Amino acid sequence: MKKKYRIAVLPGDGIGPEVMREAYKILNILKNHFSLPLETREFNIGGSAIDQEGTALPKKTLLGCENSDAILFGSVGGKKWDDLPINQRPERASLLPLRKHFNLFANLRPAKLYSELKYLSPLRSDIIKNGFDILCIRELTGGLYFGKPTGRLKKNNIEYAFDTEIYYNYEITRIAHLAFQLAQTRNFKICSIDKSNVLNSSVLWREIVKKVSKNYPDVHLSHLYIDNATMQIIKDPNQFDILLCSNLFGDIISDECAIITGSIGMLPSASLNEKKFGLYEPAGGSAPDIEGKNIANPIAQILSVSMLVRYGMNLKTIADKIDQSVISVLKKGYRTADISNNNNYLKTNEMGDVIANTLISGE
């Protein structure tokens, strides 16, 4: 590892700064207890940047990210900025440009049901008795969300709108290679999601995924149509390990997997480019309704640090220690408000302290 691993920290809006404070506790332990050569610099982003600097993504922030090895992101947005033109709102004017600027083509969304939190899942107990640990891998820069032409027109008093799904072979190839490489670090199993019985883009998707799979004979590949996949996830989520999806289908599937865990406050995510530069963030939003109340769940932000260590720094053992600290805390009965089934729960800072102390002690 090089002398310094530089992290651009972007707390953002809503609960972002609150949960980021707890992530800092973990980062400090990684520096001081595990002797990792981390260097953090904090930058403004989102609505707070609009208020202070007139733009959601200031040049200083972008430059700071360019001079870093990874981005640790909080959350952006809130009702305060909802009246702005849509392209100037924090979500559209900060996170999306960051993804585009750094060509973050791969979105990794883990969805894990912890045995201690099964009561949170909306699924029947017999369905989730064995739990599940799914990694959704979503292609993030191609497909329907970016295809041209797109528009809304009116002709002869008839209004219509259109979008275009376009996938280039190299876009599918690179996301498939990443999925197979990650499968080799997990359970050697991938299910690719498409709609190749209807869509030409999905026909190409399936053909290329099959072709790439020949380079990974130790990984079992299966395919499902998107409509069947959404049903199978509800019927038996434990049958899946890695789900490989296009942009649109991954958007749908990853949210479905998230909701059946019972709390999005537990779920981190990573967006990577071909050089493994990544943006790491909680899967949830800025939650302005609980901002400043010190009740937000910091676990997703802490696990985002774990993903940064795992995928950005390639330090699996230390990432596992962070993950295990979270599991240990849950086993001991510690809860935040969103995952508690009673009124006895920890505040945001208290949960951060418990996880940090557990990481140091290893208990």
UniProtKB/Swiss-Prot annotation:
Mg(2+) binds at residues 227, 251, 255. Its EC number is 1.1.1.85. Binds 1 Mg(2+) or Mn(2+) ion per subunit. Pathway: Amino-acid biosynthesis; L-leucine biosynthesis; L-leucine from 3-methyl-2-oxobutanoate: step 3/4. Keywords: Amino-acid biosynthesis, Branched-chain amino acid biosynthesis, Cytoplasm, Leucine biosynthesis, Magnesium, Manganese, Metal-binding, NAD, Oxidoreductase, Plasmid. NAD(+) binds at residues 78-91, 285-297. It comes from the Bacteria. Pfam families: Iso_dh. One of its GO terms (cellular component) is cytosol. The record marks 145, 195 as: Important for catalysis. One of its GO terms (molecular function) is NAD binding. InterPro entries: IsoCit/isopropylmalate_DH_CS, IsoPropMal-DH-like_dom, Isopropylmalate_DH. Substrate binds at residues 99, 109, 138, 227. Homodimer. NCBIfam families: leuB. Belongs to the isocitrate and isopropylmalate dehydrogenases family. LeuB type 1 subfamily. PANTHER family: 3-ISOPROPYLMALATE DEHYDROGENASE. This is 3-isopropylmalate dehydrogenase. The lineage of its organism: Bacteria, Pseudomonadati, Pseudomonadota, Gammaproteobacteria, Enterobacterales.
